Each structure stands twice: as C-alpha cells, then as structure tokens.
Amino acid sequence: MSNFLECKTSVLPLNRVGVELVSTQSRTGLNSSPTLPILCFNLVAISLLVLFFQGVIMANQLKSLFPQKAKDFEKSDQAKIFDRKNLYDYLDGGAELYLAYDFQRLVVQDYKSGETSITVEVYSMETSQDAFGLYSLDQEGEDVQIGDRATYGSGLLKFWKGNYLVRITDMSGNDRFIEAILDLGKNISQNIAPKGKPPELLAKLPADGLVPHSERFFHKQIILNNLYFLSTENLLNLNEKTSAVMGDYLLGKMNLKLLLISYPDTSIAKYAFENFCNRYLKTSLSGNRVIQKVEEGKFAGAELDKKNLWLTFESRDEKATGNFLRNLKKR
C-alpha cells in the first residue's frame, strides 16, 4: 500500500489522466490497484524525458565552448556528439579507457582553412579529478600555459581544465599551424569555468626523484594494466571506489615505478595487500612490508599503511627499495 501511495502522490500533479482514472474508479467502486502500472509508467516516462533534456542541455553547453574561428580557421560541418552509449563509434578499441574515468560526453568540431583541417575534441567527465586522470595518461610534449595543465607537441595540444579534457589536433601532424591551435585552446579554456582541482592523492607522491610528466591517476585495473601489466586477474581489487597514483622515479643509480592505492577502508586494503603478496610476490607475510625478487635482478615491494597500499616495481636494489618504502610510510 505504501508503494502505491508513493507512486500516486508523485505522479498526480503532473498527470491529469491519472487523476481522472483514480477518481472514476473511486466513484464506481472499482479496485484502484490496476492504475499502479499506468501511474508508474508515466513516472518513468517523465524521468526519461528529464534525462533526455538534461543531455540536450549538456550537449549545448559543450558546443558553446567552441569559438566560431581562430586565426584563418573557421568551423566546418556540424559538431558531432557522443555519449557513453555510442563512444565506441568514435573511439573503436579505446573507449574502455575513457569510460573507466566516468566519461559523460564528447563533442568533436572540425575547423578548416583551405584544405587544412584542425580537429577539436572536448571530453566531459563527471569530476575534475577524473578529467585530470584522463589527461595524465598522455602528457608527452612541452608545457604550455593553457587551462589547468597543458602540453603541446607535433601538432597536438592537450589540456585539462575543470571537468574537461581537450585535444586539438592538426591532422597534418606538424607545427605549421601552432598559432591557430594555441589560439583555439586559449579561447576554449576561457569558456570553461571554474578551474579544476587535481586529486589529493597526487600530493602523496614524493617529489624527489619523480620523473616529470610521469604521474598518473586512475581507479580501475584496465588503466593499471595499460600502464604496467600485472595480471589478467584483479589482484589489487581495483574498482570505482579505489583511487590510485603512479609515477616513475630516478633515485641515484636506482630507478623504479611507485604505485599508491587508497582503499575505502583498512580491511579492504589489508585484503588487497595479502592477495598481492600471495598471488604476485608468491611469498608469506611477516609484517606490513614485503620485498621479493620477481625476475632476474629485479625486486617488487609492498607496504601496507592503514587504508593505503604502496607498491614498487622494477627496482634492482633490494636494500634501497626497503629504505624507500620505509620513508614513504612517514609521509
């Protein structure tokens, strides 16, 4: 009965047909329960309409970010819009990586000057942190002052600002039209507000020895395996509720990869630590720190610190790896 009342109350103000049905049945003494499917169907239909119009509004907001022209380049053709359902039509084989960062929408707009074409892609993510994460996967190039972070190289500008990742590409793959590309980037960046905030977990990566542009942020195993393949199994229990950062380090004669994973609670972190040690390092536990040779001349390490799990790979110095992990716990 409570479900029926809930459904009827929420729909009646919007559905005069529903009101007439209820009142007619009340007068005739008929059982009112058959109206429940009708009322709930109408409620679902209204909800779908709301979602549809929200999508239209978001798409129009994305389109408004694009200037009409930049230097000698002007908009050409209609902008193409993609969402979570049809992203595969544009990114055949690569859509999973974007969906792993809670991708929402993509608008693609071409600009032309004569026979030359520049393509602008604006990816909208659910959060600023995920937009940064997607940007962090490819930071190759020289730093430029656009958006919250940006790099440029070989006719490709990539920048992150707010909840957006923007890619601007000269399809000829050279630097002939760098001024137009940078001008487009600056105009689009100015239309995006507010600025974004990088993931807080990023600040836990030690600055000393960190290779510039090597830091990555992600949540899921599919991203980790693209950065550093561990296993086809999800040994570290990565999912949408976990956050992870990864970076490359040069520490004197030692280089290594550092991975930090933050879990929702200590029990989940402990389970992941134990599973990693047993299944990957293939060693028994004797505390919260383990270092094990995994291949000829290379060591992997793991350090459990409450909800955080620190992992190192590719080190060739067992003792230095232990000291490195020990210092991490003090952060």
Region locations from a protein language model:
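Intrinsic disorder/low-complexity segments
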Residues: 1-50
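Soluble, non-membrane globular domain cores that form compact, hydrophobic packing
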Residues: 53-331
